[in-house]
């Protein structure tokens, strides 16, 4: 299924992509200049050999200078020196030139990752992680070869073609014009076939992204797959994606075969012209045997150059595709960013105010929140309840600006959040979610995420406050225990308490609890609930409640529904009204009600 940010929807011209790439190349212009100088040296060596052979052949046949052993030795010495120069130049081109390409690839990947960090939730909701991974890893691998070889190959080709043309014209202008008459036609055919080749490579990149996403889903969801005995369904999904990739790659090789075949046909045509026209010129005395030998060698050099460009075409198109997919990331607009007049959020107790706030998701024009006005006192514990889709999570996500309001404004301690920096805003907000995400690393690393550079003493104290120290010390390596990918080695309750410790370490004045205990067993819920009580003390706390029994003692409860805030009050006040909250409470007291 086509995604919103699928690269198939874009087709950027080669010129535009080259212009996009040039600033990265310009950063290493000194290295590039030396690389091109070395390329010129290797080209000079290749061009001189036919001239040496022409001199020897003509001398042997009595044309020009008399051939002697001394002349042969001098020519051999010249060629030997040139080959030493060629070897040194090739070493630099192969080593330093490739390293330059690696540096450029690294710079581009850094910029792509930095831009991805700035993109909002909407982008990630509409783009598969496997596709994104492919773009910042595989797609940029080919840029290394492209960055090194593209300037080098075209520079060498330009020198050889121009030099060959001038030298061949000295031998025979009519013969040279006949040979070069094939070049424009070859260029036209090559451009057409190259366009088809690039389209195939673009399709391959798209499909490998889809395949990566399928594999990621299956592997990360192994618990669900095994629970439902759905291995056959997963094999079928993978087989389809794998087969689609095979088909697209096959089409790519057909396009490459057509490209290579057309080139070989033109090679043969150019040799045929030389054999016919050159042979007749020799018969009628228009050219010497030595010049014809040199002519054949220069034509061979010319054809070898063209073949090298043809062979580079695949690498060129892969590199262009990588740059194109890189550009697609970089051109994705950053919709949530600091305003020009943004200032750091001034420290305060954490009072929050919603003024006539409305919101709708960018890809859905149905309003989730309608003209919501709400005052949350500093230090107040506020619970949000109501049916799914009522806007509870959305309302909370607007406070740290995970999404932008489409109407009205939100203030924290009297400061409009649209005019404060995102970093300072989010540093003042701690979030504990139902689905805890732990990074691959140690327990200590994950707790320290709340305060980069925290000391071990601070980490341990945060764990103690979260009620996590005892179970952490019981682990094999204590705070240095590896938690596994996404924390798979820990239970749900243990992960929640580490997440709470992370927020304790962050120590923000505002706290958002998004159904933080709803997925836990009773024992874990009690332990985590106690940790959350400690965490919420003295902080402005918004809790999205899944179980009504956990919010009975809150300062205020809001019931959100299709019409916005339908009810507001304490637990006892709302029960006394016998409205929406009363009905929810009496559905299944003490159990999941929403």
Each language-model region and where it sits:
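Short intracellular "coupling" helices and adjacent cytoplasmic loop segments at the cytosolic face
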Residues: 2-11, 102, 110-140, 213-237, ...
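A short amphipathic helical element positioned immediately N-terminal to and/or at the very start
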Residues: 14-29, 132
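An intracellular "coupling" helix at the cytosolic face of ABC transporter transmembrane type-1 domains
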Residues: 29-30, 121-122, 138-147, 151, ...
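Transmembrane helix-loop-helix hairpins at lipid-water interfaces of multipass membrane proteins
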Residues: 32-92, 169-174, 285-289
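Hydrophobic alpha-helical transmembrane segments of ABC transporter permease domains
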Residues: 37, 45, 49, 68, ...
């Amino acid at each position: 299924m086509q995604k919103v940010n699928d690269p198939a929807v874009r087709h950027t011209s080669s010129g535009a992509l080259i212009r996009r790439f040039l600033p990265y190349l310009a950063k290493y212009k000194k290295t590039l200049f030396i690389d091109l100088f070395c390329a010129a040296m290797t080209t000079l060596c290749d061009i001189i050999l036919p001239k040496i052979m022409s001199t020897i052949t003509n001398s042997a046949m009595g044309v020009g200078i008399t051939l002697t052993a001394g002349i042969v030795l001098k020519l051999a010495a010249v060629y030997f020196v040139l080959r030493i120069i060629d070897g040194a130049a090739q070493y630099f081109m192969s080593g330093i030139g490739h390293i330059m390409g690696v540096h450029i690839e690294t710079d581009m990947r850094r910029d792509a990752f930095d831009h991805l960090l700035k993109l909002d939730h909407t982008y990630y909701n509409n783009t598969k992680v496997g596709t994104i991974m492919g773009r910042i890893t595989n797609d940029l691998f080919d840029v290394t070869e492209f960055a090194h070889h593209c300037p080098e190959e075209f520079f060498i080709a330009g020198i050889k073609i121009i030099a060959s043309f001038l030298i061949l014209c000295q031998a025979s202008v009519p013969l040279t014009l006949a040979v070069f008459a094939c070049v424009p036609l070859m260029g036209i055919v090559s451009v057409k076939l190259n366009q088809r080749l690039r389209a195939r490579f673009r399709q391959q990149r798209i499909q490998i992204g889809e395949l990566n996403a399928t594999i990621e889903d299956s592997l990360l969801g192994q618990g669900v797959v095994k629970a439902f005995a759905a291995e056959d369904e997963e094999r079928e999904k993978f087989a389809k994606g794998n087969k689609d990739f095979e088909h697209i790659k096959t089409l790519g090789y057909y396009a490459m075969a057509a490209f290579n075949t057309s080139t070989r046909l033109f090679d043969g045509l150019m040799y045929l012209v030389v054999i016919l026209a050159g042979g007749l010129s020799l018969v009628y005395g228009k050219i010497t045997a030595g010049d014809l030998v040199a002519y054949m060698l220069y034509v061979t050099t010319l054809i070898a150059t063209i073949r090298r460009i043809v062979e580079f075409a695949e690498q060129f198109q892969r590199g262009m595709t990588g740059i194109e997919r890189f550009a697609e990331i970089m051109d994705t607009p950053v919709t949530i960013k600091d305003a020009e007049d943004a200032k750091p959020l001034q420290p305060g107790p954490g009072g929050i105010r919603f003024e006539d706030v409305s919101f709708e998701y960018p890809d859905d024009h149905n309003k989730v929140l309608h003209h919501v006005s709400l005052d949350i006192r500093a230090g107040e514990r506020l619970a949000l309840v109501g049916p799914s889709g009522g806007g509870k999570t959305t309302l909370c996500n607007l406070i740290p600006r995970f999404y932008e309001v489409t109407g009205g404004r939100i203030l924290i301690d009297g400061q409009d959040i649209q005019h404060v920096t995102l970093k300072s805003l989010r540093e003042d907000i701690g979030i504990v979610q139902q689905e805890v995400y732990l990074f691959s690393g140690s327990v200590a690393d994950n707790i320290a995420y709340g305060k980069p550079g925290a000391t071990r003493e601070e980490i341990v104290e945060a764990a103690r406050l979260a009620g996590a120290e005892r179970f952490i010390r019981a682990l094999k390596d204590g705070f240095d225990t590896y938690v596994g990918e996404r924390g798979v080695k820990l239970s749900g309750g243990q992960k929640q308490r580490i997440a709470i410790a992370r927020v304790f370490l962050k120590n923000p004045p505002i706290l958002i609890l998004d159904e933080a205990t709803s997925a836990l067993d009773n024992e874990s819920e009690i332990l985590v609930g106690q940790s959350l009580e400690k965490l919420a003390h003295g902080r402005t706390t918004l809790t999205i409640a899944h179980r009504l029994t956990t919010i009975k003692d809150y300062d205020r409860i809001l019931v959100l529904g299709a019409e916005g805030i339908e009810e507001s009050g304490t637990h006892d006040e709302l029960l006394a009204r016998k409205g929406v909250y009363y009905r929810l409470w009496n559905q299944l007291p003490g159990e999941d009600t929403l």
